[in-house]
């Protein structure tokens, strides 16, 4: 292959990697979702945030629109477990922006910590699966009805190291993230026939309010976030680097953009080698 062709291809990449794209992000009012929303908007995307947290979601939109001459961000109140809410959110994006190019399934629950399955609440288990799996499924379903006629699109779901290995969170969380990974691969097989890419990302521990549920009781300190960061650092494979919401957002940006135009059905690990390491051996420790 000609090196000249390669050079011209790379030099033509826009600095705003999502310029003109329309993205719908569930759970975009706080945490990783908020970081994704802000990064996408910075890269030229028109964004729709779907969340239950009206005040926080509205504030994110207001901050994005300061100095803007036109509406490039909307907040939509919606519950990912309710099909009508998701259908309406997709319709809203199309009505206001003309299409839907990108779906980010970020809304999720960690589930209540319970080390003994005999005491695990069925209602807690079902709620976690409803948000993490059913929510992702419904969002994929309704995004697909817009993307299939267009013969293009990118869907990225937030998975986890808990979708690859066991023992890193509540049973409902780990089980649901394994399901999201399987759903991603299954939907990628179908939608690839229509030019639509479907991927997921699996981060290691990120210090967000949602993630604090993963912290074992004996590791909890007066400052919950300090305790979580110390616990994550002690158990990480990659030392000296703390995984942040912005690191995850950058990985999602890569999969959402045309930079990854031939990547589909993939699970991008953002774990510093955590899941490829047998921590019981301690050979290098």
Curated annotation (Swiss-Prot):
It is found in: Cytoplasm. One of its GO terms (molecular function) is identical protein binding. Gene3D superfamilies: NAD(P)-binding Rossmann-like Domain (3.40.50.720). Changing residue 145 to C: In gin1-2; reduced absicic acid synthesis. Keywords: Abscisic acid biosynthesis, Acetylation, Cytoplasm, NAD, Oxidoreductase. Its EC number is 1.1.1.288. CDD domains: secoisolariciresinol-DH_like_SDR_c. Disulfide bonds: none annotated. It catalyses: 2-cis,4-trans-xanthoxin + NAD(+) = 2-cis-(+)-abscisic aldehyde + NADH + H(+); 2-trans,4-trans-xanthoxin + NAD(+) = 2-trans-(+)-abscisic aldehyde + NADH + H(+). One of its GO terms (cellular component) is nucleus. Changing residue 176 to F: In aba2-13/san3-1; reduced absicic acid synthesis. Predominantly in roots and stems, and at lower levels in leaves and seeds. Induction: Constitutively expressed and not up regulated by osmotic stress. SUPFAM superfamilies: NAD(P)-binding Rossmann-fold domains (SSF51735). GO terms for biological process: abscisic acid biosynthetic process; proline biosynthetic process; regulation of abscisic acid biosynthetic process; response to fructose; response to heat; response to water deprivation; sugar mediated signaling pathway. NCBIfam families: PRK07231.1. The biological substrate is probably 2-cis,4-trans-xanthoxin. Belongs to the short-chain dehydrogenases/reductases (SDR) family. Involved in the biosynthesis of abscisic acid. Catalyzes the conversion of xanthoxin to abscisic aldehyde. This is Xanthoxin dehydrogenase.
């Amino acid at each position: 292959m000609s090196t000249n062709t390669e050079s011209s291809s790379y030099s033509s990449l826009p600095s705003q990697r999502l310029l003109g794209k329309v993205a719908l992000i569930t759970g975009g009012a706080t945490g990783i979702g908020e970081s994704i929303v802000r990064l996408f908007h910075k890269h030229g995307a028109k964004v729709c945030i779907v969340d239950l947290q009206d005040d926080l979601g509205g504030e994110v939109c207001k901050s994005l629109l300061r100095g803007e001459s036109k509406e490039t961000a909307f907040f939509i109140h919606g519950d990912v477990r309710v099909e009508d809410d998701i259908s309406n959110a997709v319709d809203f994006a199309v009505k206001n922006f003309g299409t839907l190019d990108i779906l980010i399934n970020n809304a999720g629950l960690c589930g209540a910590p319970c080390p003994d399955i005999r005491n695990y609440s069925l209602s807690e288990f079902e709620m976690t699966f409803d948000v993490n799996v059913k929510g992702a499924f419904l969002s994929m379903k309704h995004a697909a009805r817009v993307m299939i006629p267009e013969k293009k699109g990118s869907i990225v779901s937030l998975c986890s190291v808990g979708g690859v290995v066991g023992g890193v969170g509540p049973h409902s969380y780990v089980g649901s993230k394994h399901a999201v990974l399987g759903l991603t691969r299954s939907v990628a097989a179908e939608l690839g026939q229509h030019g639509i890419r479907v991927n997921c990302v699996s981060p290691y521990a990120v210090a967000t309010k949602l993630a604090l549920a993963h912290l074992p009781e004996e590791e909890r300190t007066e400052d919950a976030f300090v305790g979580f960061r110390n616990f994550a650092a002690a158990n990480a494979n990659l030392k000296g680097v703390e995984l942040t919401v912005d690191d995850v957002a950058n990985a999602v940006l890569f999969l959402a953009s045309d930079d990854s135009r031939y990547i589909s059905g993939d699970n991008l690990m953002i774990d510093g080698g955590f899941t490829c390491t047998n921590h019981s051996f301690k050979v290098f420790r």
